[in-house]
Amino acid sequence: MRLAPIKLVVNYYVLFGKSLNQEKENLIEMKGVITQCLSNGMFRVKLENGFKVIAHISGKIRRNFIRILLGDSVIVELSPYDLTRGRIIYRLKPTNSSTETLRFNTNLK
């Protein structure tokens, strides 16, 4: 009797052709720089293509207590349905010799 719910879940994925990782395939990942720190783990991020988005911290970054500060370079995950909001999934290590980082930091606003 306990196998019936598991069988229903498996049949659902077989019938509708959905997998657990299928939703992650549609996401867009872009580099950006933190321009403003908002409340509750929200940040305003300027992407390398010039767009500005509001992004929140992913769960893994919260659990590992990774600090994200103003001017940090990050990777933001965007949904194709709403390109104004995103999730910060990685903080890039700072490099002093990178001219790209300096260019981003001078144009924060």
From Swiss-Prot:
Annotated source species: Tupiella akineta
Disulphides: none
Identification of the protein by name: Translation initiation factor IF-1, chloroplastic
Pfam families reported for this sequence: eIF-1a
Alphabetized InterPro entries for the sequence: NA-bd_OB-fold (IPR012340), RNA-binding_domain_S1_IF1 (IPR006196), S1_domain (IPR003029), TIF_eIF-1A (IPR001253), TIF_IF1 (IPR004368)
Subunit structure: Component of the 30S ribosomal translation pre-initiation complex which assembles on the 30S ribosome in the order IF-2 and IF-3, IF-1 and N-formylmethionyl-tRNA(fMet); mRNA recruitment can occur at any time during PIC assembly.
Taxonomic placement: Eukaryota, Viridiplantae, Chlorophyta, Ulvophyceae, OUU clade
Gene Ontology MF terms in the entry: ribosome binding; rRNA binding; translation initiation factor activity
Compartments, as annotated in UniProt: Plastid, Chloroplast
Encoding gene, per UniProt annotation: infA
Chain's role: One of the essential components for the initiation of protein synthesis. Stabilizes the binding of IF-2 and IF-3 on the 30S subunit to which N-formylmethionyl-tRNA(fMet) subsequently binds. Helps modulate mRNA selection, yielding the 30S pre-initiation complex (PIC). Upon addition of the 50S ribosomal subunit IF-1, IF-2 and IF-3 are released leaving the mature 70S translation initiation complex.
SMART domains, sorted: eIF1a (SM00652), S1 (SM00316)
Domain (S1-like) ranges: 18-93
Domain of life according to the entry: Eukaryota
Any one GO CC term of the record: chloroplast
Family per similarity comment: Belongs to the IF-1 family.
